[in-house]
Amino acid sequence: MSQVKNSRRKLIEGRAALIVVDIQGELFVERDVQAIPCMPNFDKRMAKARIAIDKARECGIPVIFIQEVHRIDLVDFGRELDGSEDVHCLEDDPNTAIAARELDFRSTDYLIRKRRYSAFFGTDFEILLRGLKVDTLLLCGGLTDVCVHYTFVDGHQSDYFCRVIEDCVAGSSETAHESALRAMEYLQAGACRSLMETLDAMEKHEDLSPENRRR
């Protein structure tokens, strides 16, 4: 989708956080039948998120990992299984864990566990964002058309500046991926940005962490 964007806003407004959506071990396991449909090169796009994670750490930008997880009796799936997805991300499956090796996930990192598509729904995500004094959400992960999109919309409706790193998200299909990017761009002009643009903005980002704001 990359093209010149007409936006009155900077890529990063105020204080940023990198939001890593649902990049879990399951995505890097080869199976004959996948519980969730994925577009081609899905795993390669997810692996690219490591570049953004490393740069965020280097620049003092907080990294927040989002993990989808469901109880083994399926009681919290709700209507989720009425669509194209099969049972996935169960608590007792080791592949439900964040892809620690691929992403350099650390025990000290921020982690939000969710039961539904949006990272905001039924979680303490917004409490964490307020504590970190975050203004801009830099989103990567999957699916573009599901959890990334729903999180973007809830962030938008909560008045956060929302950006999607195009190279580091992937959808259930190429068509769904592109449609979701267009839908998010409709909400905030300039929302969809390349990895290189985002890395450059991170490099120039002033560390406005709560600690520095108090100085």
Spans of model-derived segments:
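Active-site-adjacent betaalpha module
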Residues: M1-A17, D54, E58-C59, D82-R215
